[in-house]
């Protein structure tokens, strides 16, 4: 579906951040800023935090210990819950190789569940 040569390919549509966050919230969801290190720059991440995000993906395969500290502090400063992800896509030979390679604390999971 994501590849242009796929028979089911659907082109991406660019949507403004406030609009997509509104859609997520109206659907009862929580808007999370995903893998901030992979965004343009930390300055841009901070600029994006003017929007009504609920959480931030602090733990990610591309985040080192310094990144985790920095994003954890940003999440706390902006009252965002902390989440994490492995970015596992099931592609052989591409890290992470399996579920469970990257974990978040039970406290972070409990906080997330309490917000649902």
What are these regions (language model features)?
Residues 18-22, 26-33, 37-116:
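Charged catalytic cores and adjacent phosphate/nucleic-acid-binding surfaces used
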Residues 1-16, 20:
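Active-site-proximal loop/helix segment associated with metal-binding centers of metalloenzymes
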């Amino acid at each position: 579906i994501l590849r242009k040569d796929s028979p089911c390919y659907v082109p991406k549509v660019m949507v403004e951040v406030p609009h997509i966050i509104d859609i997520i919230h109206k659907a009862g969801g929580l808007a999370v800023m995903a893998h901030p290190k992979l965004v343009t720059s930390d300055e841009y991440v901070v600029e994006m935090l003017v929007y009504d995000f609920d959480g931030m993906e602090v733990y990610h395969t591309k985040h080192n210990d310094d990144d985790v500290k920095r994003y954890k502090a940003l999440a706390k400063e902006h009252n965002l819950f902390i989440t994490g992800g492995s970015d596992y896509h099931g592609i052989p030979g591409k890290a992470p190789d399996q579920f469970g390679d990257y974990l978040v604390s039970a406290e972070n999971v409990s906080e997330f569940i309490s917000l649902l």
